[in-house]
Amino acid sequence: MPRSLKKGVFVDDHLLEKVLELNAKGEKRLIKTWSRRSTIVPEMVGHTIAVYNGKQHVPVYITENMVGHKLGEFAPTRTYRGHGKEAKATKKK
């Protein structure tokens, strides 16, 4: 079920404060965050946010197309290495 419009989007306060502070200064530097649940808002466009995937921080450059999505969508947590290969049969004489 979608979130109510009267509530607005969710962005962690500490992350939004950092973005607004950088916008006021006119700086564009890497912002580290563990908040995968935060929604991308228009104020974040042009920034690079390092989103934690459980192992490392994955740098994500925010574009206009990403607005409305969650930060966690762009930092995959699982690495798929393919299905297991069948063991080669040994040749017997």
Curated annotation (Swiss-Prot):
Q: Which gene encodes it?
A: rpsS
| One Pfam family in the UniProt entry | Ribosomal_S19
- Might you report a single GO cellular component term? cytoplasm
This protein's assembly is summarised as: Part of the 30S ribosomal subunit. Forms a loose dimer with protein S13.
Provide this UniProt record's keywords sorted from A to Z: Ribonucleoprotein, Ribosomal protein, RNA-binding, rRNA-binding
Any one GO BP annotation for this protein: ribosomal small subunit assembly
Name by which UniProt lists this protein = Small ribosomal subunit protein uS19
Note the Gene3D superfamilies from the entry: 30s Ribosomal Protein S19, Chain A
Q: Which family does it belong to?
A: Belongs to the universal ribosomal protein uS19 family.
Any one GO molecular-function label of the UniProt entry: rRNA binding
Q: Which InterPro entries match?
A: Ribosomal_uS19, Ribosomal_uS19_bac-type, Ribosomal_uS19_CS, Ribosomal_uS19_SF
Superkingdom per UniProt: Bacteria
| Purpose of the protein | Located at the top of the head of the 30S subunit, extending towards the 50S subunit, which it may contact in the 70S complex. Contacts several RNA helices of the 16S rRNA.
Q: What species does this protein belong to?
A: Thermus thermophilus (strain ATCC 27634 / DSM 579 / HB8)
